[in-house]
Amino acid sequence: MQGVWNDSKNAPWDSKYTININTEMNYWPAEVTNLGNTTEPLYSLIKDLSGTGAQTAREMYGCRGWMAHHNTDIWRIAGPVDGAQWGMFPNGGAWLTTHLWQHYLYTGDKAFLKQWYPVIKGAAEFYLDYMQKLPGTEWKVTVPSVSPEQGPKGKKTAVTAGCTMDNQIAFDALTSAVKASEILGVDEAERKAMQQLISQIPPMQIGKYGQLQEWLVDADDPKNEHRQIGRAHV
């Protein structure tokens, strides 16, 4: 959040990497502005997180693959921290891997894709175990799930199932893993499982204001002016 250039011994937010939009947003311009060579530090962080995040996925959720929550640091922590409105966000790792896929799309570097495929696959594989069937539907959703720092109908926060942001990050992670496996000609069985899960992700919902719903239920507050715009991912 603060980087190395700040004037505080104890920087705001501990100067950690906030990966529920902040870190990603800082790197969004890299490929499109032909500055892809600036992403190496980000890739190093992702590689480290795929290790600590595999332990978190296994021990906290009983899931394969790897994941990270909303915040990490120089020790590459992957577990939840702080309050539920921030911490119960299981998509930080998967969101970061979109930068790996974007690099391939911009460069066509198949050697790069092969090198990073295990990390891309691992982030998607987590969702195969983590996403659960929503009662009364054929959908599978993330649960627990939060829309970071947001809550329905103006409430401070709500831990729920299948926030739109979660579903779309899962869709992106699974889709890039499927496409990468097709390009590399590997993991056909896992690819089919991921394709099946993609078909069960809920479609985005349109609410009474004509808005893209933040949750599966129509509970958006049109007067919400909170600065956290992670949901802009969708």
How should each PLM-predicted stretch be described?
Residues G122, F126-A180:
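Acidic/histidine-rich catalytic neighborhood
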